[in-house]
C-alpha cells in the first residue's frame, strides 16, 4: 500500500499507514541525518505540494518495492528492510529510474492493525527534488 498510495497521490491513505508519532529519517546532500515527524503539519503540507506538483506537471511515480528482509517479528512489532526502485514517467513519454532506495521500516501493531512507526530512507542517488520550483 505504501508505494501505491504515494504513487496515486492519495495522501490521506498514505498517512493512514503511519502511527501518529511516526519518525522519518533520511540524509541530506552533506550526509547529515534529517529526522522528521511524518505527520507534522509542515511535513504533510510539503508532501501534498509535491503530489500536486507531480499531478499538475504530468509526472507519474512508481515505487517498485521488492526483496523484503524481515529482521524481527513478534505479535506487536516488526522490523524489516526493503529495496525499492523509484521510477518516474514524465508527460506520459519517458520512463527513468530516479534512484534505488534501501528502506528500513519498523512497524507496530495496534488494535490489530500494522502501522509504520519508523522509516529510514537510504538513497543511492539524490531525489529529483529540484524539479519543483
Predicted regions and their residues:
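A beta-strand edge to alpha-helix "cap/lid" segment located at domain peripheries
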Residues: 54-133
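A solvent-exposed, acidic/Ser-Thr-rich amphipathic alpha-helical stretch
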Residues: 11-83
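Short, aromatic-enriched amphipathic alpha-helices that serve as compact interaction elements
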Residues: 1-7
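Alpha-helical hinge/cap motifs
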Residues: 8-10, 112
Amino acid at each position: 500500500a505504501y508505494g501505491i498510495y504515494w504513487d496515486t497521490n492519495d495522501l490521506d491513505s498514505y498517512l493512514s499507514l503511519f502511527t501518529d508519532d511516526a519518525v522519518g529519517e533520511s540524509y541530506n546532500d552533506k550526509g547529515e541525518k534529517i529526522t522528521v515527524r511524518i505527520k507534522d503539519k509542515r511535513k504533510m503540507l510539503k508532501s501534498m505540494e509535491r503530489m500536486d506538483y507531480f499531478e499538475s506537471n504530468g509526472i507519474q511515480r512508481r515505487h517498485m518495492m521488492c526483496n523484503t528482509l524481515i529482521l524481527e517479528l513478534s505479535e506487536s512489532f516488526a522490523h524489516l528492510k526493503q529495496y525499492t526502485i523509484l521510477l518516474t514517467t514524465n508527460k506520459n513519454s519517458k520512463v527513468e529510474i530516479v534512484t534505488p532506495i534501501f528502506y528500513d521500516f519498523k512497524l507496530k501493531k495496534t488494535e490489530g492493525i500494522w502501522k509504520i512507526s519508523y522509516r529510514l530512507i537510504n538513497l543511492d542517488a539524490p531525489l529529483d527534488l529540484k524539479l519543483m520550483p
